Every structure is written in C-alpha cells, then in structure tokens.
Amino acid sequence: MRKNEYSDYRSVIADSWNRCIAWGLDHDHEPAPLRPEPARLEEINRQHSELLSVTEAEVLPYYRNVLSNSRCLILLADQHATVLSSWGDERITETRLKPWFQTGANWQEQNCGTNAIDTSIAVGGPVQIQRNEHFLKTNRSIIGSAAPIFDAHRQIAGVLSVFSDAYLPQAHTLGMVRLLSQSVENRLINRQFGPDHFQITLNTTADNFDSPWSGILVCDDSGQVIASNQRADQLLGMNTVE
C-alpha cells in the first residue's frame, strides 16, 4: 500500500469512528440486530429481485471455484445496509454474531459502529475493516471487506461484502470483492439496456476486453452516451454521463 493510499485508508477509519462518537456509541455497546417486519423484508427483497438474481449468478460460481475451502461468508446488502442474502461458510464466527449475517440484519453505523458494509456506503467506495478497526468491541473478532455496486444512474444499488474470522490474505480479499461488485454492476447494465442499445467496451489493452475491469459505455441511436460503469469513468478520467 502506497503512502497516500494508507493515509486515505486511515482517514476512512478515523472519520467513521468520529461519526460513531457523534452518535453517542460506546466501544462496549452490544446492539441487537435491527430487522424489518416480515412484510417489509419481503417488499425489500421484491424491490431488489434483479440485484439478487444477478449477484447470485456472479457469486456462486466464484465461490464454488475459488472460495469453497475458505472460512468466509459473502453478504449482499441493499443501499441501506440491510442484508438481502448470504453465501458461504456460516461457521466463520461465534454464535453471538450469527444473527448479523442473516437476511434482514441491518449494519448501519449508527447502530453497530464502523463496519465494512455501511462504511463502504458512507464513503461510496471499497473498504476493509480489520479486527480492531471496528468501533464496537463485539465485532473485533471478524474482518470485513466491502465494495458498493452502482446502477447505471450512479446510485448505490447494493453492497457486496466478504467476512472472515480467519487470516485470509486481506489484499486479495478486498480485490476479490471489488472484482465481484464490478461484475455485478456490468451485468446489471447489460440487462437494463440489452440489444436495443449500442455498447462500447474500453480497456487499457486489447486482450482484456472480456475482463470485468473493462469500461462500458451504452449509447442510444444518436450516439449519445446514456449509461456507463464506474470503470469507464476511471479510464476516461471524466463523468461520461451528464
């Protein structure tokens, strides 16, 4: 990690802790998971049905091929930090934390302190929260990595995260969750616009066009860019959709 990246990383943690202090949280606070009523949870899942199906299509093959022997759990949460689904090893943590990894659990910082899911939402980018970087002591046995999933309108549609209580290579874990979230974002764009629009694929080398890290521009019949993924903005150094 380069010096400026480390400085930014430390700032993310410090800013989150300051928010927790402002909300009146204490390090010894042990919150109960906040869950929506069953009818409300059903409505939330219905609203995010496409996100759920797309994420499952991307995550399950990757988990089976790469992570099936790892002690980790993959969570999909909505834009308000409510868990929509999970995949992986449910034995990753002690019994008292298991309710937090179940559908409907809400990870908002205001209730459960610094954590990968809602801190990622707060900063609008990927984060990794190591054990003692969690504001609440109750969460310090786990490591979380998370990255937001953006829709075609630059809004956060959800958050993909990986939690573990084992010493996995953390740089690899954060890179993996970023890759998966980008894959989901790309597939959401493809589903939304489909064959009725023109798609331009960008990358730094010609042999990487099929990579999830490719930039995607979607154009209408007049050639106007109407949608793009985050990677396209990074490659072009500009907001491609105004």
Question: What role is predicted for each listed range?
Answer:
Residues 89-92, 96, 233-241:
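PAS/PAS-like sensory domain cap-loop motif
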